[in-house]
Amino acid sequence: MGVAMVSLAQRVVRAVGESPVSQGVADAQELMYGPVIDWARRSPLHTDALGHSVHPMLTDVTLGCWLGASILDLAGGSGARHSASLLVGVGLIASGPTAVAGAGDWAEMSGTERRIGAVHALGTDAATFLLLGSLVARPGDDARSGVAQW
């Protein structure tokens, strides 16, 4: 009974946080995005005026749009393609302030937390670029190529 159960998610987060590869990702992002990160730290989006970071709230807008687009793509049929494209676009627009707020938070992190944040940012960068490609491929009579990208 005294053995604590550690979930798979907790083990993955711990492994990412302790990985030297994650440190390499963090170092590369610091090098690549250095000036943006410095600006993000001073931006109005990096504030705790609400008692906490605004980054988690902004992610709800971005992810909500992309989830809605996914649902419309899967279940909405051809009549929902325009709405799905609109949601992808709004999600992409929202991803900018979301990333800035996250970068400002990340700039103040260190150690394991910073490595996990760097891997998180890498994943969201990849998703953003895939969705940008999806949006570009959507116009026209055959929007399936834009949907198939993700």
Please state what every model-predicted region is.
Residues 1-150:
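Short amphipathic, positively biased membrane-proximal segments
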